[in-house]
Amino acid sequence: MLVKTIPATEGWDETSDTFVSTPEITLTLEHSLISVSKWESKWKKPFLAQDNKSNEELRDYISCMTISPTNIDPMIYRTMPVNIVNEIYEYVNDSMTATRIVSNKKGRQQSPEQPTSELIYYWMIQCGIPFECQKWHLSRLLKLIEVCNAKSEIGRASCRERV
């Protein structure tokens, strides 16, 4: 979980051709499977894909990550200072774990399949991971799936071929 205080701002909104001001607000954010699922249902594409996302898509993901408060003026996300956006994305990209998996398979190729929230839910089911883990930082959840896959018994269907 990440808590960020967004300072009050005043500026020109080019969309509405008006001066706007936003109050200082403290956001509680979580990069989780729930936030990825919300974002994918709006944008209809995999969040974890390696493609470049627009500024609008990236800032919208921050709104999907917001746990509290609710009913936030969308202008807060549009006027959020770049340094705070960068801090949020450092948090998103943090592994949140000390666990490392060393593959002993030579020449192992990664699956070309792009993970979506539905696919990650499937992996959770296959691995027997409880749904309450959907609230975890996404990197931790993906690492747990990778650990389950690495520890799975020989002959058992793999929870996930690629993390």
Role assignments for model-derived ranges:
Residues M1-W43, T70-R156:
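An amphipathic, hydrophobic-aromatic interaction surface with interspersed Lys/Arg
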Residues N55-C64:
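A short, structured beta-strand/loop element
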Residues A157-V163:
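Conserved small/polar residues in nucleotide/adenosyl-binding loops
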